[in-house]
Amino acid sequence: AALDLVVPVGGYDASRAANIGRNYASIQPAYLVSWIDPNGLNADAKVGMSLNRTNKDTGYRSGNELNIDYALGWGLGNGWVVGVGGHLYQQLSDDRRNGQAVPGNKGRSYAAGPNLKYDSGKGWFITAKLNKEFSVRSRSEGTSFWIKTTIPF
């Protein structure tokens, strides 16, 4: 289990269409589970919620969100795991502006694509994944390429 706290940092100007920061806090509890077999099935899932607060400059509060990241792969026995992964995203509650619901604006997206992971056997690993979004509603759609390195302390 994990608890992330996102704080409003970065530049924000309500008159700009795009901003670096979101200008509101979000509390994000999550549950993570993994099954690792160097010579077989590997499975990872992270299920999390984003409990969003109000942007004080605009009076806008994005609805609460469910995020599920997943990966399913096969260990080749030499540290490499090949497979697929992606995400499921669903906004669960309406956005609100100055306390009033903004109906019909709930976001949704799904993504899937290939994953490649190398596990060093010494605690650190690196993952590359390509995700193509589909069935997107009320948010931008695209393809993302991620490289993630995990190093234990």
Please place each PLM-identified region on the residue numbering:
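Outer-membrane pore/translocation modules
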Residues: 1-61, 103-105
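Outer membrane beta-barrel transmembrane domains
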Residues: 62-153
